[in-house]
Amino acid sequence: MQTGLDFTLVEDLVAGVDEVGRGPLCGAVVTAAVILDPAKPILGLNDSKKLTEAKREKLFVEIQEKALCWFIARAEVEEIDQLNILHATMLAMKRAVEGLSITPKLALIDGNRCPQLSVPSAPVVKGDSKVPAIAAASILAKVSRDREMAALELIYPGYGIAGHKGYPTPVHLEALARLGPTPIHRRSFGPVRTAHEARAAIMLGGSIPLPVGLLQD
C-alpha cells in the first residue's frame, strides 16, 4: 500500500530505496534498500551522481558498516526485455526491500511511483538529494553497478563499457554499430534492436541500405 506521509515525522526503521541503470543499453538495473541507524550518522550522504567516485567508494563501505541493514538487488537484462524497463525496475526495488533483514515501517522510494510492497511506501521526487536513506541506497546501487560494468569490460572489450557504464554515448553507439550487440545488451532498446537487425541482415547475406548521400551512380 502507498501512503502520503509527513516525512519529518518518520524516524526509525525507514527504508530508502533507489535504482541505477534504467537508461543504459546494456547490463542489469541495480537497486538498493537501506535502513540507517539514527545512532550512527553518516556524514556526506548525497545523491550518488553528485559525489566523486572516491567519495562514493568510501561511503559504500561506511554505509554497509553503520546501517541497521541493507540489501542490493537487480533485474537482469532478460527481465528488462521481457517486462520493459519500468516494470523491471519496480521488480528490482521490490526485491531490495524484501531482502532487508529488518522489516521497515515505511519504504521511501526515489522518484514518482512505488513498487507494490507489503509495507507502507511513498515516492519522493529527487529523494536521493532529500532523504539520507535514499541517498545511501543510491550510493550502494551505483557503486555496485559501476563495479560490475568494469568487470564486464574485460569480458566484452571494445565497447568502452567501463567508461560509459552502458549509457548511449557516441563511443558506445559506434561500437554497437561496428561490433553488434553482446548478450548483455538490452534487445528491447531501440539502438540495440537496430544494431541486432543490421547484424542479422549481414549474417543472412542481406544488404543494408546506405544513406542517400553515399549512393553513387
From Swiss-Prot:
Domain RNase H type-2 intervals: 12-201
Gene3D superfamilies: Ribonuclease H-like superfamily/Ribonuclease H
Top-level taxon in the UniProt lineage: Bacteria
Cofactor: Mn(2+); Mg(2+)
EC number(s) stated in the UniProt entry for this protein: 3.1.26.4
Broad class of enzyme this protein falls into: hydrolase
Compartment(s) where it occurs, according to its Swiss-Prot or TrEMBL record: Cytoplasm
Catalyzed reactions per annotation: Endonucleolytic cleavage to 5'-phosphomonoester
Entry-linked SUPFAM superfamilies: Ribonuclease H-like
Listed PROSITE patterns: RNASE_H_2
An annotated Gene Ontology molecular function: manganese ion binding
Any single GO BP term: mismatch repair
Alphabetical UniProt keywords: Cytoplasm, Endonuclease, Hydrolase, Manganese, Metal-binding, Nuclease
Binding site for a divalent metal cation: D18, E19, D110
Cofactor note: Manganese or magnesium. Binds 1 divalent metal ion per monomer in the absence of substrate. May bind a second metal ion after substrate binding.
Main location: cytoplasm
One GO CC term, this protein: ribonuclease H2 complex
Homology family: Belongs to the RNase HII family.
Functional note: Endonuclease that specifically degrades the RNA of RNA-DNA hybrids.
Protein name: Ribonuclease HII
Organism: Pseudomonas syringae pv. tomato (strain ATCC BAA-871 / DC3000)
